[in-house]
């Protein structure tokens, strides 16, 4: 398996991970926006990405793009929050560009999205770019819920 990834030159930030499993058909892509990248890279999918792939297959997509509201790579949100620039210098550019390639955009960044007001910023950025964001559910605080913590058959909702 190989995933196309776009990293910063020092690999401190991962802006985009693309995973496609059916090259015989035209690309039908879904974009997911999480909190921040973990260790997933060109060679491996983490549990969240495997869950996302299952959702995409169920809904007849053959590709997904994974982006995040913060592009800094960390497995712990506490570590990400200590970073001086967790967003990354090119993240907003990649969010807008990638959204143009996708039939569906699903937000899933959870409650930590309130850090630096980033949840509201990204919703405004993509809404201003003419995009409609969806989610699989919301946290108690009203943020788009993470897919690992939801049943596999949950229905999409517009944010």
Question: For each of these PLM feature ranges, what is it?
Answer:
Residues 29, 62-63, 104, 132:
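Residues at the starts of beta-strands that form the adenosine-phosphate
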